[in-house]
């Protein structure tokens, strides 16, 4: 079989599958709506999270550990601690605030007369350490313990409750997204499978005659796979339209909720690359469901034979 002939077979299968859908507009529309509803919720949640990055960014800020050197620590001691912290791969960022810088900031915020009454500079050198964003609360505690054991470090402070709360929020969002994506993806496959199965049953005699005439399984399966492809494309388009409508509907309500707190939602729709991924993923799910349905029917035919 030449490449041109093989290509023409696929083009003809795609055209016949599209015509088959257009012959039953009402049934096709119901199927598209059913498939679109199955994917609208995870897509809309993704849009909501991406649009709300300005708000979620405040929750995603990594917790920090403030390290206080001893007041008697020399510059060489601070340099040693800085070197040790820099070599620690668990840390994402290290900021040093020298005692002189701290005193200057204190002078700008307090009365000069009060500062002049101080006997020397009572402030220590300070390091503000930001661990890697993926650090768990248990790992944060380990980092905290290791830092307090460094030479000439007097103490360190960390908001352990905020670390735990932040981790739980991020884990909750991540698990909800995975759960919705998995369950609704499975629902989409099952709906596509059932839709193609009904199409196969409606053409059962035609398929069995074709099989008896010696047609290969790929020839029988091909039009149904393309039918699933067209259904996936159209249902994805309907779902994206629903997402756009939902976005415009909830936008004023959400803005009204966050406006008193000075929080602005950066609303957006899918980028071109994201649209390509959505269509590709949905087509893959639909074709997989159709493949399962056709394979099941062909196996049943072999068993009867």
Curated annotation (Swiss-Prot):
Pfam families: FtsX, FtsX_ECD. Gene3D superfamilies: 3.30.70.3040. The keyword Protease does not apply. It is a multi-pass membrane protein. One of its GO terms (biological process) is cell division. Residues 1-28, 197-229, 290-305 are cytoplasmic. It is found in: Cell inner membrane. PANTHER family: CELL DIVISION PROTEIN FTSX (PTHR47755:SF1). Belongs to the ABC-4 integral membrane protein family. FtsX subfamily. Part of the ABC transporter FtsEX involved in cellular division. This is Cell division protein FtsX.
